[in-house]
Amino acid sequence: MSVRKLRTLPVEYLWDGLVLNDDIFNHTGAVLLLPKGETVTRNKLDKLMGFYGDNKNVMVYEETYVEIMTNEHVPPEVRQKLTENHVGYAHLHQNIGNLFERRDYDSWLSGEKLAPLIREVAGKLKDFDPVTILSCINFPRPMDEGLQRHSLNVALLNGMQAEWLDLPPDDVHTLVLAGLLHDIGKTMIPEEIVNAPRRLTDEELSVMRNHPVYSDDLLKGKFDDNVRLAARHHHEKLNGGGYPDGIAGEQLGICARITAISDIYDAMVSARSYKGARLPLDVFDMLYQEEFDGLDRQFVMNFLKNMRARYTNQQVVMSNGRRGEILYIPLNDADHPIIRQDGDIRQTDEEWYCKEILTAN
């Protein structure tokens, strides 16, 4: 018989009128505070808040945690912060930021010195369900939160793709490393261009397009060629229409092809000053419809197959403000999934659509 897992929950996310589907325990999990079936009242909340002084947490079972944290009483940014702390995403982001802010590349930019960080990132792929990790990646956030966050996201997405392709552990680590360092050359570009709060001018875009070459220069002689060339070639296209070298077909390595998909996906689900963040479902449709030409179709289809499977059965907020559940995501029409809402099952359209995908892991 499996042991049910307890999770820490801040008392402030309980609310007056909540009917408990399971027991609530104290912050150590040893003392039953509120039994299953009991209704939370304002008086009980006040007692819980004062029960253990500065410790304002209780312990609940995993199922109760998810139910509470996906409720509309809990603001999305709160759910996000708790999820990122639980996964260790916030810790990874901080560590990567500390490295990227240093310009003494010789002191840290090597496979040996980055190995512990890469193992930690790769370990998240084993320890957490992809949907939990994707909830960290997909949460709408401004691009000026940093190159570091984008690099972490691409590393995680690369690792997921490697796992879904059943690649051996060494290749998973190589792809995670390639994702982490794919844009390292942007540290050589003026910050006012990298973090410009608008679309770049033609002149600025020309400068920005040098970043793959700068990445190559920084990584040359320090890393496996697969890592270096993924950084140089992740903006190349199979049809020869990419940059900086205009290579095509078999000249484009597998590591670069996979990194290109991860890079595009993360860019599209992130907000910029001149565009909003796209829902994952929208990006799935764009990838299937080949709006990003020159990608490896085999890898794109594998990415979509696995992403669609992970988002099926997830909770969503619909345009009418009510909750629903994704029952099916059509491959050729991913931005119009089949939704169940209050017993009604139908496909979304232009007037009834998904506004938010909910996760609380």
Cite the ranges covered by each PLM segment:
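Terminal helices and disordered tails flanking the catalytic cores of nucleotide-processing hydrolases
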Residues: 1-109, 114-115, 277-361
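Short clusters of hydrophobic/aromatic residues that line enzyme substrate/ligand-binding pockets
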Residues: 24, 193-194, 200, 238-243, ...
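Short alpha-helical linear motifs
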Residues: 142, 195-204, 231-232, 255, ...
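Alpha-helical scaffolding flanking metal-ion-dependent phosphate/phosphodiester catalytic sites
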Residues: 154, 177, 181-188, 205-301, ...
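Acidic/His-rich, divalent-metal-binding segments that scaffold phosphate/diphosphate chemistry
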Residues: 68-206, 220-221
